């Protein structure tokens, strides 16, 4: 999320690639505000939804073809000279020269230079291939800097390679692949690209509609590249709007409820590659960009984990930190496959319902029935908590010993949430939890203290870190003061810290005001460096919780810096140096955000010059535009520029591939699927796939969410006022397909895939239309995924079959997210 939802009102054009009006209705107010001010709204979605109803143009496209669409837009912008050249030359790697040995997918039939066999995976090419990236690099000059061609004409320049790569993505090709009529695509391309540039800006929204694919990361890259090409990053009314699925997805990501990272997006060490702290920091710290500070953030994190026990002599406790055995072994899908195979013995499930909500849920339930024990912490007895009651399962055959811990919902606890726009907001409880129910913080601290008592006196090295870790926040060990938890996340001084003149800057224990003050020598501790500044502390020790600030936006501060705290540094639009030209002047007066004022008071009394404006500068506010790196906005990259050329696991440029299950051959190249996507081979028909052109599974299916329900239904199926809003589980089917297979609105239908089947009611609608794909009619249906076998007994419609029983265990090769937005199915009348 590069921007702020409030700023969407400044957009000249908004492209919603997801169903924002229904799934993010509060944030959608800013889309409507922009529309009131004259902005055009484009909705790109296979289904006509409430978002479509208030948009100027609805663009239905076949699920799984987003890269073809975005690639077509980039090609259109370049071919019609609609890209923002000054921005592109100044702030991106478009002018950088690439190794002449590199070949694009245009040259190699849909592949990139360097595809190799790994020697793993047997005959399955999807686990047996990887890319050798040795030619995916810049040409360097004698000083080790990338060579550049500012004219963008050199055939080895990123720009020319980009142009060549997307030269195949013509309006005609987009029509053949996506099913978007050529005339409509050209209209949309002209509208979006024509409303971007020096004087105008556009923004694009996305959510799981783009991520849940076997090229999910490349979908997002394609979107970002389009925004870079048009000069829409770091500027008012521009940006990339990543819409989160519920109130604290962003916070969970920041604090890293992820397998491969530590809080603050620090890489999780690998056992073999990072045997000691020195090696880890050397390998994971780049030579340029803001991540040169990674040692400060990482050592401060270790100090937050292990306190006084973390010293320079013991690598600040680095050896106590768990290490990954492999870079690709611990994702959600890896874990459940290993669980099914008996490699995982126990499972602690806190606030998740994988029996319903995850991919290939049938596999997940079977896996959870094979454990030694499982703990579920939730506010209701979910399908996961009672997985032994899965319909068709004999409880006597379930091996797993189950423990259920009732949890407290948001209204029963204090704490913070970090929402879509990186905004950390505080909430206070309305009532206490009933009976013996504990808040999350209480439960975790009580559990940790109990385990520490069990392990007290252990002489094993592996136990020392856990025994040293602090789980006491306040005077009552098992009743943590959550503001003190936030203070630890924010960061604090572990000893008195003086400046170079000997003046006291921080007293021991005082909260840090900025992550700039973090150190790599153990003098600071901090649980998540990007949150530093959310807590301030007065000299007398009083905490000032900025997450609890409530000043609404006004004319002087439309970005509402006085409302809560946005990481990093309360900055609302990141990369905002890009809102001004090389000289520090706004590209446009009506799009100004920050600018260089040469007469403003400088960093010291004897100097002048400072970046000023409407937001917190995303870099050193006193760094002049003509100073070294004063013209580089993308500070989190080592080369400080936005990346068109970015070597990921499946290519340096996004390339269209068909979903693993598809109704058509790849019309763009000979390479059908992502060559390095992950597909698991499993016994017992747990992950069978529909072959290309299968007559048994001829229809495309996509899954989605509803306004009236929440995720796997735990927060909605148990509440009558929400559960009654839909009569039953349903499948959306076009009028054309319904007529073809003899289905009427309200009929029961069976939707099946090679993995499983569900029964639902048919919702026959004109909101879905068949696609014409290369002259062939392709039908697509849509099925929400909120239902499970539990719900309100008096409302039978609150219960239903599990949509995710239909999906497969396949994954994107970079982050291993599932492909649940595009796969193949069959639809038959009745219960079959």
Model features per residue range: what roles?
Residues 1-33, 37-39, 43, 68, ...:
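Extended redox/cofactor-interaction regions of prokaryotic respiratory oxidoreductases
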Residues 47-198, 286, 444:
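Long, well-ordered, tryptophan-enriched scaffold segments
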Residues 53-61, 385-387, 406, 423-434, ...:
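Short beta-alpha connecting loops at secondary-structure transitions
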Residues 90-94, 191-192, 207-209, 239-250, ...:
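A glycine-rich phosphate-binding loop feature that marks nucleotide/adenosyl-phosphate handling sites
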Residues 173-180, 206-214, 243-247, 351-356:
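Conserved short loop/turn motifs at secondary-structure junctions
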Residues 376-382, 387-388, 432-448, 750:
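Phosphate/diphosphate-binding loops
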Residues 415, 422-523, 528, 535:
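Long, C-terminal catalytic modules of enzymes
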Residues 442-495, 597-599, 604-606, 615-616, ...:
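Long, contiguous, secondary-structure-rich segments that constitute the structural scaffold
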